[in-house]
């Protein structure tokens, strides 16, 4: 009772003080620190009270203050600022752009510390992560970018099979995942160890962006221009620079959860970020811990999507005489006797793989003196992903053992992905030069475990779980960079140069013997069908049937002869110059020479210019040459995967480019891809609250590395070394890495933003689009293989390169903040794509493919956030609010299963409600 009385007295005093406090009017103007322009729509709140105002179109404001000591100014995209009133009646408030320390502005694509995205000579997007984490449905790095950047493309699992389904690889401008370079805090990041198989970017390696906690990121910069001359190999399509948080004295917690309409596919993600100041001179350490879960998702769309309608206990892929006795009625009777139905054999996958992610990262810096800082950043992550493949039915006698799995089995592949990196460096002044000495080490490891499977060729001796091996990729980069700004050379000259030494490594570790072994060829024993109507081997476990599938099914283990441990060294030097000829005219140039220990020298260059016709209009253009060194994995990777063609499981070997079989076919060793790129664009800021960029681009790439189509073991014209390879591995088909084709990519991109005061609230509208076209301009057919032109570059691979990524993408997003509410409305247009699916390989020289056009789709997200206090916000919303799905697989290629949604445009999750909670303590 005493506490209640005290509370009543407290609120009475507070209320009375508010009534009788003397009124005063405070006014002023709010401007932006970067361009000094007035900011309209800035929210002004009296700290501790539910009173406030917003700035007018000219940035001015006026607010009546009855009580309170502080005014809080906040605006989307800028850092909030707290100002003490202390008797003042007029204020001139300057807001800094969010995430930018104005003493250290760094925009990727320029080594001039004062360059901004609008006055850059190349197209750069700068994406603030904070509002997306609070209001958008997406939570992982790749999905956040997929729905905000028109030139960026990534779908869950990249529509790949096996280990590739664990990754969501990043692509820019429709080019490959290995033709974009990723930096963290401006330093080169290491790649994933995995070689993507069967999906977008087939045959490529890429960057595992989702191993970086989204909660650790301050902003992401996307350079949409070739930059190999500035940053080295891979930067053909552009560069993604992830800038980590430096903020201190703030504990931020973001947690979210979502589920699909049928209750499957639930996700959770919790991120905790905290920064601590070190000393009194600006030192800091900012750390993030993040944990995420993904539950299994069923195929989206119709309730019977993926339902199997064919023979179950007989009539399998390798039909033999006794299978003729099995009819649908007999199958259904057996199912009923077992208490199951056809849904027991459903596919289990319908989007992202189920799994768990545990991520840690940090970013730190400490001044040694007024001109010298030491810094470090890095992280470690462990991610588990489970992939299930095609159900092995009990009637598939070549792939099942009915004593072990009477009802067949659904093999499961579990990938454990461990990723770690550490960067340390020291930067400061040596005379008038800025000097940065750094070392960055990174490693990515994929381990493959197969469960609920078997090696059919071993009979009852087969294990059901296998260690199928693992592979590792590492990179260590040491760099020394110099830069200096000469203020008195014309209107300013920035000179940068430096050197790097990089060591890259790749390793394959063999799996356990049962994961790859094949039993001896022995006499076929008869099949007895007298036991419960279920076929079994009369002498199973003692004698193996000739022709049964060898190795762990879903993913065959790496064989000892495929194990490798290779490395290479790269030495590079570069120079980068930017000259402001006049206040309006900027020219820049860069050159880079690199030496690779495995294939020699490469030189690239870039030239760019920008001219300001007025404060609101810049014209820019660039030309560059680039290259991409083949990854070690592409040169040495060997693996066997199972693909189902016309309902029949086929073991396909991806053979090493270094193998004798490759040489026998006439396939040479890999060489670098080389590119030429051109861009022309404009930027405009007609007002302080609107920005617009438009850029056209053309990229020619020669000798792109990819997987050939599949050579078949039944082809009598193949060289002896290739036939030996088939005999050793038991594979029915084989493909090789090869510099097989050249391409041309052209397109137009536009981006823009508009900030406006709307009915006492702030509206931040973002828009962008990319319209592109990819075409194959040349196929490099090895001498002697002219008849195999449709195998060297198969129609399926041609489609992956040219038409599997939407040629048109439009992003529209509005965030409206008023009082305590924040509303997000976003819609993204994914253009038409065309797929090519194998129908028949009866003629190995001319395989038959079915082409399917998938219609364009609009995907719309909606959310509403409520800010309970200045430090606590809750958000609820719906991803894909109209439940828009892509087209279903055409029945002619769906086989004996009902068609499922083709998720190649944006994934296939369908409608997905979500909630988020963001707190700052």
What function would you assign to each model-found segment?
Residues 4, 701, 773, 829-841, ...:
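C-terminal beta-signal and adjacent terminal beta-strands/loops
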Residues 27-47, 70-78, 86-134, 142:
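Short, acidic, small-residue-rich periplasmic hinge/interaction motif at the N-terminus
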Residues 89-95, 141-144, 168-170, 208-210, ...:
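N-terminal periplasmic accessory domains that precede
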Residues 120-169, 177-178, 187-209, 221-228:
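Periplasmic N-terminal accessory/gating domains of Gram-negative outer-membrane beta-barrel systems
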Residues 238, 243-258, 267-269, 355-363, ...:
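Surface-exposed extracellular loop regions of Gram-negative outer-membrane beta-barrel proteins
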Residues 357, 420, 554, 558-569, ...:
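Outer-membrane beta-barrel signature, preferentially recognizing the C-terminal barrel domain
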Residues 409-424, 428-429, 441, 453-585, ...:
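Outer-membrane beta-barrel transmembrane domain signature of Gram-negative proteins
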Residues 696-839:
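Gram-negative outer-membrane beta-barrel transporters
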């Amino acid at each position: 009772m005493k506490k209640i009385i005290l509370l009543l007295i407290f609120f009475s005093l507070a209320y009375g003080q508010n009534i009788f406090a003397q009124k005063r009017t405070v006014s002023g103007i709010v401007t932006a620190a970067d361009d000094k322009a007035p900011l309209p729509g800035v929210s002004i709140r009296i700290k501790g009270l539910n009173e406030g105002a917003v700035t007018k179109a000219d940035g001015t404001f006026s607010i009546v203050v009855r009580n309170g000591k502080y005014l809080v100014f906040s605006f989307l995209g800028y850092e909030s600022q707290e100002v003490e009133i202390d008797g003042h009646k007029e204020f001139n408030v300057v807001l800094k752009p969010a995430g930018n320390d104005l003493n250290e502005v760094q925009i990727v694509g320029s080594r001039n510390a004062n360059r901004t995205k609008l006055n850059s000579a190349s197209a750069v997007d700068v994406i603030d992560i904070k509002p997306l984490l609070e209001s958008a449905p997406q939570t992982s790095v790749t999905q956040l970018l997929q729905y905000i950047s028109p030139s960026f493309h990534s779908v869950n699992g990249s529509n790949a099979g096996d280990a590739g389904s664990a990754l969501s690889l990043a692509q820019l401008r429709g080019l490959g995942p290995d033709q974009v370079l990723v930096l963290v805090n401006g330093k080169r990041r290491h790649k994933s160890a995995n070689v993507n198989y069967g999906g977008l970017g087939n045959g490529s390696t890429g960057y595992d962006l989702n191993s970086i906690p989204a909660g650790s990121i301050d902003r992401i910069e996307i350079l949409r221009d070739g930059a190999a001359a500035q940053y080295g190999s891979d930067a053909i399509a552009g560069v993604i620079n992830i800038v980590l948080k430096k903020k201190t004295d703030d504990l931020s917690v973001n947690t979210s959860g979502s589920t699909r309409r049928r209750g499957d596919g639930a996700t959770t993600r919790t991120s905790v970020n905290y920064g601590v100041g070190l000393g009194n001179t600006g030192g800091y350490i900012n750390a993030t811990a993040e944990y995420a879960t993904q539950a299994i998702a069923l195929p989206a769309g119709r309730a019977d999507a993926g339902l199997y309608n064919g023979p179950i206990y007989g009539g399998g892929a390798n039909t033999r005489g006794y299978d003729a006795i099995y009819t649908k009625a007999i199958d259904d009777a057996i199912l009923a006797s077992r208490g199951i139905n056809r849904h027991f054999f459903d596919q289990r996958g319908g989007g992202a793989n189920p799994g768990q992610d545990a991520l840690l990262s940090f970013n730190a810096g400490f001044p040694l003196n007024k001109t010298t800082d030491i810094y470090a950043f890095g992280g470690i992550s462990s991610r588990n992903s489970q992939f299930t493949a095609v159900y092995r039915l009990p009637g598939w006698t070549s792939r099942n053992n009915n004593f072990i799995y009477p009802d067949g089995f659904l093999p499961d592949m579990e990938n454990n992905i461990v990723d770690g990196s550490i960067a340390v460096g020291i930067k400061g002044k040596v005379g008038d030069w800025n000097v940065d000495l750094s070392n960055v080490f990174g490693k990515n490891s994929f381990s493959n475990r197969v469960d609920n499977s078997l090696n059919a060729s071993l009979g009852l001796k087969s294990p059901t779980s296998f260690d199928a091996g693992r592979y590792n990729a590492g990179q260590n980069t040491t760099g020394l960079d110099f830069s200096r700004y000469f203020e008195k050379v014309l209107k300013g000259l920035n000179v940068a140069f430096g050197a790097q030494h990089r060591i890259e490594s790749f390793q394959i570790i063999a799996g356990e013997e049962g994961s790859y072994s094949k039993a001896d060829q022995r006499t076929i024993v008869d099949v007895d069908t007298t036991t419960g109507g279920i076929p079994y081997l009369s002498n199973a476990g003692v004698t193996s049937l000739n022709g049964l599938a060898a190795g762990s099914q879903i993913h065959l283990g790496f064989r000892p002869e495929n194990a490798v441990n290779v490395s290479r060294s790269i030495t590079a030097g570069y120079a980068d110059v930017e000259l402001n000829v006049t206040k309006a005219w900027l020219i820049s140039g860069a050159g880079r020479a690199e030496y690779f220990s495995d294939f020699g020298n490469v030189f690239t260059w870039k030239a760019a210019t920008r001219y300001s016709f007025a404060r609101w209009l810049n014209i820019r253009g660039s030309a560059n040459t680039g290259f991409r060194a083949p990854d070690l994995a592409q040169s040495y990777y060997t693996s066997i995967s199972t693909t189902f063609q016309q309902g029949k499981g086929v073991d396909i070997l991806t053979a090493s480019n270094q193998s004798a079989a490759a040489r026998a076919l006439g396939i040479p060793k890999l060489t670098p891809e080389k590119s030429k790129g051109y861009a022309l664009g404009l930027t405009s800021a007609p007002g302080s609250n609107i920005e617009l960029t438009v850029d056209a681009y053309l990229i020619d790439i020669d000798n792109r590395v990819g997987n050939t189509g599949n050579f078949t073991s039944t082809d009598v014209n193949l060289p002896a070394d290739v036939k030996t390879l088939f005999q050793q591995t038991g594979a029915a088909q084989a493909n090789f890495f090869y510099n097989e084709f050249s391409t041309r990519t052209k397109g137009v991109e536009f981006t823009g933003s508009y900030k406006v005061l709307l009915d006492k609230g702030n509206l931040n509208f973002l828009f962008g689009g990319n319209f592109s076209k990819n075409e194959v301009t040349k196929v490099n057919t090895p001498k002697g293989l002219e008849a195999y032109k449709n195998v060297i570059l198969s129609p399926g691979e041609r489609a992956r390169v040219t038409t599997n990524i939407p040629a048109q993408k439009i992003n529209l997003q509005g965030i409206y903040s008023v009082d305590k509410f924040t509303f997000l409305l976003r819609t993204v247009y994914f253009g038409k794509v065309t797929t090519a699916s194998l129908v028949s390989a009866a003629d190995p020289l001319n395989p038959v493919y079915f082409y399917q056009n998938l219609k364009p789709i609009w995907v719309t997200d909606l959310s509403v956030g409520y800010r309970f206090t200045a430090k606590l916000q809750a958000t609820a919303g719906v991803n894909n609010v109209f439940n828009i799905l892509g087209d279903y697989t055409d029945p002619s290629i769906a086989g004996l299963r009902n068609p499922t949604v083709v998720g190649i445009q944006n994934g296939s999750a369908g409608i997905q409600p979500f909630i988020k909670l963001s707190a700052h303590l």
